[in-house]
Amino acid sequence: MTGRGKGGKVLSLGGKGGKGAKRHRKVLRDNIQGITKPAIRRLARRGGVKRISGLIYEETRGVLKVFLENVIRDSVTYTEHARRKTVTAMDVVYALKRQGRTLYGFGG
């Protein structure tokens, strides 16, 4: 890695050992459905909820998606400002703090 500076990776375009162009593109499904009904039910139980309406599950997924989009957007902003390509735990901690949700136990 001498002489290339920071972040100077060499890209190979096929051949032995290198990855060529991908033949198939991965289909992005709606990953929010990965937050299952039992997972939402467990979170509600932890919060002291006894009975849950059937309409709650989709609403919870929507709210969680918006929340995570905001936190991830702020985290990536911190990462880009520091000229890094890896989002650190501290980026997420600072993003949460910016939104008024201070998180303890992850440094800082």
UniProtKB/Swiss-Prot annotation:
Keyword annotations of the record: Chromosome, DNA-binding, Nucleosome core, Nucleus
Top-level taxonomic group: Eukaryota
Pfam families recorded: CENP-T_C (PF15511)
Cited CDD domains: HFD_H4
GO cellular component, as recorded: nucleosome; nucleus
GO MF annotation terms: DNA binding; protein heterodimerization activity; structural constituent of chromatin
Family statement: Belongs to the histone H4 family.
Assembly with partners or alone: The nucleosome is a histone octamer containing two molecules each of H2A, H2B, H3 and H4 assembled in one H3-H4 heterotetramer and two H2A-H2B heterodimers. The octamer wraps approximately 147 bp of DNA.
Function: Core component of nucleosome. Nucleosomes wrap and compact DNA into chromatin, limiting DNA accessibility to the cellular machineries which require DNA as a template. Histones thereby play a central role in transcription regulation, DNA repair, DNA replication and chromosomal stability. DNA accessibility is regulated via a complex set of post-translational modifications of histones, also called histone code, and nucleosome remodeling.
Name of the featured protein: Histone H4
Organism: Mastigamoeba balamuthi (Phreatamoeba balamuthi)
